[in-house]
């Protein structure tokens, strides 16, 4: 528990769990020296504390605020794209480079086989997503999941390759935004994202987009045009982060909680607004508490969606995708 990453709202639970663990250790170490009545008393105290821990856990995670969900989406131990790829698929072949400038490590992708042996489902897919790092060194290598123009161009190259071989495309979105540096702008960041929107809308193969963590602005939508949009329970998807919104409206990051409430960036919010199609349930406490279970749930939902989408003709897929995104938003005439 010493190395566990604890968010501010999780501290009461963490402290209670630590106390429970201390009591268990004490019971194990002193069991030979205590008589049975003392052990019974301690066992009852442990059982009562276990109930208290579970009650507190449910109270916290069943009543998360929007800002707390944003924090969970950024959790350092949350599974990233490559984690999902290796847990959900086999025979992944990573492909590199945009064939124009370089290979952006903030976006990974390649062909893999998504299969479910009991049901007999086995399908080669092109799977692409943002990739963050676990520590300072790997985050610098991955640019904190913020893609350069060549990252989006690499993603588009892989999507067009999937279209050529008539294979479905799956994108996993987890980014704090596209890289905003001067060099990215010089190499056409806006054009690269816009080109992806244009081309993804016209792909003749099924496209499923999944927000697994952060979904910030153009950096997210650059991989986000699909027939079906799925979203993890504790992820967020918005035109701007709560902190940036707060700094613009209130000239301070201190109002990020209010900004999160106003932005309504959570899966429940976006499902109600018709922006996404399904919410992926997470284990209690977040995807990082049981990555294998989370990957299993996502894999099951992807297979369900692919079975439906792969039965449709190419022109139907394109038409439904365009109509889906054309119908989003609210405006006055």
Curated annotation (Swiss-Prot):
Gene3D superfamilies: 2-enoyl-CoA Hydratase, Chain A, domain 1. Keywords: ATP-binding, Cytoplasm, Fatty acid biosynthesis, Fatty acid metabolism, Lipid biosynthesis, Lipid metabolism, Nucleotide-binding, Transferase. It catalyses: N(6)-carboxybiotinyl-L-lysyl-[protein] + acetyl-CoA = N(6)-biotinyl-L-lysyl-[protein] + malonyl-CoA. Pathway: Lipid metabolism; malonyl-CoA biosynthesis; malonyl-CoA from acetyl-CoA: step 1/1. InterPro entries: Acetyl_CoA_COase_a_su, ClpP/crotonase-like_dom_sf, COA_CT_C. Residues 48-308 form the CoA carboxyltransferase C-terminal domain. It comes from the Bacteria. GO terms for biological process: fatty acid biosynthetic process; malonyl-CoA biosynthetic process. Its EC number is 2.1.3.15. One of its GO terms (cellular component) is acetyl-CoA carboxylase complex. Its main location: cytoplasm. PROSITE patterns: COA_CT_CTER. GO terms for molecular function: acetyl-CoA carboxylase activity; ATP binding; carboxyl- or carbamoyltransferase activity. Signal peptide: none annotated. Acetyl-CoA carboxylase is a heterohexamer composed of biotin carboxyl carrier protein (AccB), biotin carboxylase (AccC) and two subunits each of ACCase subunit alpha (AccA) and ACCase subunit beta (AccD). This is Acetyl-coenzyme A carboxylase carboxyl transferase subunit alpha. The lineage of its organism: Bacteria, Pseudomonadati, Chlorobiota, Chlorobiia, Chlorobiales.
């Amino acid at each position: 528990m010493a190395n566990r990453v604890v968010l501010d709202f999780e501290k009461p639970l963490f402290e209670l769990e630590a106390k429970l663990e201390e009591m268990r250790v004490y019971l194990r170490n002193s069991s030979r020296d205590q008589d049975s009545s003392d052990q019974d008393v301690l066992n009852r105290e442990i059982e009562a504390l276990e109930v208290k821990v579970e009650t507190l856990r449910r109270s916290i995670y069943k009543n998360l605020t929007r800002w707390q969900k944003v924090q969970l989406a950024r959790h350092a131990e949350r599974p990233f794209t490559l984690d999902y790829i290796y847990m959900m698929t086999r025979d992944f072949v990573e492909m590199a480079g945009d064939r124009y400038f370089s290979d952006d490590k903030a976006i990974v992708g390649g062909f893999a086989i998504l299969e479910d042996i009991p049901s007999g489902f086995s399908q080669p897919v092109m799977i692409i997503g943002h990739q963050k790092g676990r520590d300072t060194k790997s985050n610098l290598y991955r640019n904190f999941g913020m893609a350069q123009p060549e990252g989006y161009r690499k993603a588009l190259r892989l999507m067009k390759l999937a279209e050529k071989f008539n294979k479905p495309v799956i994108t996993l979105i987890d980014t704090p935004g596209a890289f905003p540096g001067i060099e990215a702008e010089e190499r056409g960041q806006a054009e690269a994202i816009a080109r992806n929107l244009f081309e993804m809308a016209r792909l003749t193969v099924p496209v499923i987009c999944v927000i697994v963590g952060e979904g910030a602005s153009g950096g997210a939508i650059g991989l986000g045009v699909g027939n079906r949009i799925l979203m993890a329970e504790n992820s967020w998807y918005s035109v701007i982060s709560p902190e940036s919104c707060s700094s613009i409206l209130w000239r301070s990051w201190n109002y990020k909680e209010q900004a999160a409430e106003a932005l309504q960036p959570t899966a429940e919010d976006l499902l109600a607004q018709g922006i996404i199609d399904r919410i992926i349930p997470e284990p209690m406490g977040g995807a990082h508490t049981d990555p294998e279970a989370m990957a299993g749930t996502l894999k099951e939902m992807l297979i369900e969606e692919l079975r439906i989408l792969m039965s449709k003709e190419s022109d139907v897929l394109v038409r439904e995708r365009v109509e889906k995104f054309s119908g989003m938003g609210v405006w006055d005439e």
